[in-house]
């Protein structure tokens, strides 16, 4: 049916009259929708691709099944620690940051992963096998988590004094630990920043 149209977005829309009027396409599934496939032989069978994975509908989008047995996610960056076996840290689109084991007895399942940050997860780096530094988009929520005590120090992002031109941050702003001194951290927006005390103080170095 050429008049049956879909416009995908964070609130996908549907038209049944060639685009003259639009309504919300579906509820309870998706988020940032990226692709939809419709069976050419049965238009009621649909597969939706979105930031959290895929959804399957057999009734034209009225009801959906989220295929939660598929390990689907959009990772921006990966970090590891020095545990044995080591843990993997990942920043994920729309799903924050997660930590999971690199190996275990039996298979690794979704339940083995724990949430360690919010927003759109970005960089996750570990110093001294104890301090985790991570952030969300545009360096938001940049903080330090003590993996031994679970104490979190948030708001480590550097801001210039009021009245000065503020920094511009990339969607995923790099965080790097010095290989020579684990207390020294580098963070970057439109300038490179250096901290000598685990992110508690910053100096512009570029």
Language-model region placement:
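Beta-propeller blade termini and top-face loops
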Residues: 1-206
